[in-house]
Amino acid sequence: MPENTVEGFRSALAAGAEAVEFDVRLTADGVPVVVHDADVSRTTDGEGLVHELALADIRRLQVRGENAEMQVPTLAEALVAVAEADGGADIEIKNVPGDPAYEADRESVLEATLVELERTGFAGPVVISSFNPDTLQRCHELAPEVPTGLLSIDAVPPSDTLEVAEHDGHAFILPSVRALLGGVGVVAEAHANSVRVGAWNADDPATVRRLLALGVDAVATNDPTMAHAVRTAWLREGGAGERAR
């Protein structure tokens, strides 16, 4: 299933995922939509920057993939679909330096996301995640009850991410798989300090097993059917992994 689509979320949750991860950006007219890239050309049949397109423009786009009927969903549509499947949501806020839509002095994407969470009454488990610590700090100010997760790239040691998370009060650290597997003792240290650990992305059985062996709390994957099967087998064998996502 194509990424960041309602159909993809339903498929992942039906395959055994407990939650889905998706990315949120704002249209030119301020509507939060679920799309990863700043430019729509990779994932749809259109072109242009999300923040320069109105929702009506986004609605005319078709998501690339086997099913040409899929569209870019609004955040509200995504939340309703996830709630109907009794799933959770890891919502990544796209507001980082270097992004064409980056706002250094505002958090419009975050604010719109929090409004939609309240308006839709989404009651499933939720985490607001971002690579931008300032975004997460603003989330604490606006909605202290919402857990936050700090994302980090390959080049950032997970121990550094954990240090920031402990200082800023984040519920999760979310390093890349490569970085986490290269770290020593980070998962145990995080758990000792009441911080949970997820990793992105694990798309083969061996990697999922290695992460489960480390005791991670969540595994982000593009293949939920595979990850769920590996986790099920791991638990059957007496493993200590908690959950695959």
Identify the function of each model-found stretch.
Residues 1-245:
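Phosphate-group recognition and catalysis centered on beta-loop-alpha active-site segments
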